[in-house]
């Protein structure tokens, strides 16, 4: 299994629609020349952006977090250019980009150092072969202070690994429950 380069990522995005919308280079400034948390193609990965749709955990309804019986009232929905995550709390968002993962590829997501150095941890489970959709992003604010996430700026990096052998059964073949997801998707069983 080998990691894929910027050249491969560009080719797959432009010819196969693997990432939409796609940025072939690294974007570091907005149209007003203001600094951004970078996004776009890097040497061996793709830095994704966070969309404007967020779900922030709240304890207003005294709900218990149960992945088998998830209560939607555990979250407050926010649509904004920024999201303030309360101290020691958690939020969900989604990528701006829609992914179509090839059958021979497994994609792993890692947080960006800009956020990690502020105590904001990004967690995403692997994007399996032939999975497609917007990626639901999970953020943990590990600090005792409120933390800010910026929409439409870089938030995490996707790394693409291609296997030497095609899998027998892909995520699509299994009828995976998160196939084709759009928007911030809550837990399913």
Swiss-Prot record:
Keyword Kinase found: no
Sorted alphabetically, the keyword list is: Hydrolase, Nucleotide metabolism, Nucleotide-binding
Spell out the protein name for this chain. Answer: dCTP deaminase
Segments traversing the membrane: none
Q: Kindly list the GO molecular function terms attached to this UniProt entry.
A: dCTP deaminase activity; nucleotide binding
NCBIfam families in UniProt: dCTP_deam
Q: HAMAP family annotated for this entry?
A: dCTP_deaminase
Kindly state the subunit structure of this protein: Homotrimer.
Top EC category: hydrolase
């Amino acid at each position: 299994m080998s990691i894929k380069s910027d050249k491969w990522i560009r080719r797959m995005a432009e010819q196969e629609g693997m990432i939409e919308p796609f940025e072939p280079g690294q974007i570091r400034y907005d149209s007003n020349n203001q600094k951004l948390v970078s996004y776009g193609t890097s040497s061996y990965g793709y830095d994704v952006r966070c969309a404007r749709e967020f779900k922030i955990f709240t304890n207003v309804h005294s709900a218990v977090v149960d992945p088998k019986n998830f209560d939607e009232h555990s979250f407050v929905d926010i649509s904004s250019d920024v999201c303030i995550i309360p101290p020691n709390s958690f939020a969900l968002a989604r990528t701006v980009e829609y992914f179509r993962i090839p059958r021979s590829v497994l994609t792993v997501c890692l947080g960006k150092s800009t956020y990690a150095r502020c105590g904001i941890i990004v967690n995403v489970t692997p994007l399996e072969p032939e999975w497609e959709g917007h990626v639901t992003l999970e953020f943990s604010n590990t600090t005792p202070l409120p933390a800010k996430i910026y929409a439409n700026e870089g938030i995490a990096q996707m790394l693409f690994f291609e296997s030497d052998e095609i899998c027998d059964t892909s995520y699509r073949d299994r009828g995976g429950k998160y196939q084709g997801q759009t928007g911030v998707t809550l837990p399913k069983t």
